[in-house]
């Protein structure tokens, strides 16, 4: 059986390697590792012209919108909190277009951390711009439990209370249209959402690529492998 092609969005940042110092498409290695170990083929999707998103998504079997910078608050009608990071406008525009194309075409979609937040914003939802105590230390992945909502797509993948790797200071506030919560943290923070009106569209607030639990990515790969 042919393995499905899973596109993973990337940073576009200044980077230095060897004798070079220039802008580069950057993707932490755990992302393609997770796709590959879950049975898929991974390809990088650096920011591009938003009007090409639908054509690109049509060539993919599945889409992963990866973690990264805070979503610019203007995207959900808010002023920036002083604790919100600098915007990545080109990436916001590109990834919102990819999400809209995936939802319109029924392409299986997984949003990770920022990717979950963008899914919510794409559907008209809003974000909490800062949560105290959700980052243990700068650059250190923490862990906490998430509880699935019975009957949801996420619960079908991980039906029990699960300890997950996490690194975020923002979260979903008002849910976007057609989205339902599918997991919560112990403090009530929404930790997963899914689109009830899409064949397979899930967002998780944590970082599955930083752990060994393949179930969420395996779910995406299975959905991307299924015949249309």
Regions found by a protein language model. Give the residues of each.
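Active-site-proximal beta-strand elements of phosphoester/diester hydrolases
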Residues: 202-206
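Hydrophobic, aromatic-enriched interface-forming segments
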Residues: 116-118
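N-terminal beta1-alpha1 cap of cysteine-dependent amidohydrolase-like domains
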Residues: 1-112, 121, 128, 132-157, ...
């Amino acid at each position: 059986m042919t393995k499905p092609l899973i596109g993973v969005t990337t940073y576009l940042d200044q980077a230095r390697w060897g004798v070079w110092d220039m802008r580069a498409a950057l993707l932490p290695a755990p992302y393609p590792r997770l796709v590959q170990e879950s049975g898929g083929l991974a390809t990088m999707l650096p920011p591009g012209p938003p009007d090409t998103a639908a054509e690109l998504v049509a060539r993919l079997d599945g889409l992963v919108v990866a973690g990264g910078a805070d979503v610019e608050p203007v995207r959900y009608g808010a002023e920036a909190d002083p604790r919100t990071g600098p915007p990545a406008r080109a990436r916001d525009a590109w990834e919102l277009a990819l999400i809209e194309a995936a939802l319109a075409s029924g392409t299986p979609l997984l949003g990770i951390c920022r990717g979950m937040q963008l899914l919510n914003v794409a559907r008209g939802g809003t974000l909490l711009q800062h949560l105290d105590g959700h980052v243990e230390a700068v650059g250190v992945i923490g862990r906490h439990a998430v509880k699935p909502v019975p009957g949801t797509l996420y619960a079908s993948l991980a039906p029990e209370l699960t300890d997950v790797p996490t690194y975020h200071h923002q979260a979903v506030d008002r849910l976007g249209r057609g989205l339902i919560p599918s997991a919560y943290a112990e403090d009530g923070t929404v930790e997963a959402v899914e689109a009830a009106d899409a064949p397979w569209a899930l967002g998780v607030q944590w970082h599955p690529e930083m752990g060994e639990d393949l179930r969420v990515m395996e779910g995406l790969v299975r959905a991307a492998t299924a015949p249309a």
